[in-house]
């Protein structure tokens, strides 16, 4: 087969996403009212979770993606526990069209990091004297769309 001028078509390299490293950048767990907060609660605590994704270009085709998860459990006006986790990975991404690069970095990379961050949070909460907190799966596509809409409304580049 030729490309019309008699020369064979150039082989199109397949897109690649490689995880080069994963690590905890920052972890904080606070149990400000222990040991009183460890007593059996009359009602389920209100748990508020915030998730954000950030990325930095480290080198050609290499990106650090950070999944930030913050949470707080409250019973009435009493804080039972709070936590912050910044869990990151270094990814090598090659042969991906430029228009697909940003969504790949901001959706697929955090999706790969999430199970590890979830386990770290569950363990930290358990080690703080509470039942493990098992985070629900995250819709990273929806999170990406929300962030893009917010940036468009604010007139900021992505």
UniProtKB/Swiss-Prot annotation:
Location(s), subcellular: Cytoplasm
Main location: cytoplasm
GO annotation terms (biological process): protein folding; protein tetramerization; protein transport
GO CC entries: cytoplasm
GO function term, MF aspect, one: unfolded protein binding
Keywords: Chaperone, Cytoplasm, Protein transport, Translocation, Transport
Matches recorded under SUPFAM superfamilies: SecB-like (SSF54611)
Task performed by this protein: One of the proteins required for the normal export of preproteins out of the cell cytoplasm. It is a molecular chaperone that binds to a subset of precursor proteins, maintaining them in a translocation-competent state. It also specifically binds to its receptor SecA.
Protein name in the entry: Protein-export protein SecB
Organism for this UniProt entry: Rhodopseudomonas palustris (strain BisB5)
